[in-house]
Amino acid sequence: MGLFKKFKAPKVKIELKLDEVAYDYKDKLTGRIVLDPEEETSVNEFRLEFGGSKKVKWKKGFSSYSFTSSLETKKIPVGGQVKVQKGQHYEHPFQIDIPLYPKPDPFTEVEVKVKGVATVQGRPDLTHEAKPAINFPYVIECDRDYGGCGFMTQPLSEPVKTCPKCGNNLEEVWNREYSEEAREAARRPQRF
């Protein structure tokens, strides 16, 4: 292999094809990773990488807080080694459980991206990304830092507003939390 070939991805078209455009978090994510190589290529591994963003938008009276953060990347192997020839059409099917990215309150939205990856030793990975709509549940914590008891719910389709363990008003807990976050954000230096 030439020195410069190590820095270039193999000449292979890759596509992540999901069977559905929308899923519930309890569903199996099904589909296939499709390769159409323009050169002979040895794939070491097929995997799916889940990531994305979590967006918080809270407003109470004259106070508001918005924040976006990255979700933890979760890598799930879905297949092993395969050698594909130039001009050969190859499809690698998969069926996996969707990793859980729960929403902690009614002010948080989760957007997930799924990347199909084919790794080639010594060369850049082949990747293709899709953004399925995945309905994630609420997992609500009665946060001790803001006057709660620490109880955490099982996954729920709708957010609860009262802690099932201590009866604490969770809206008040969230308001304390996001009011404090908004004050801290206002104190931070602004970057332009």
Question: What annotation goes with each model-predicted range?
Answer:
Residues 1-192:
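C-terminal beta-sandwich interaction modules and adjacent acidic
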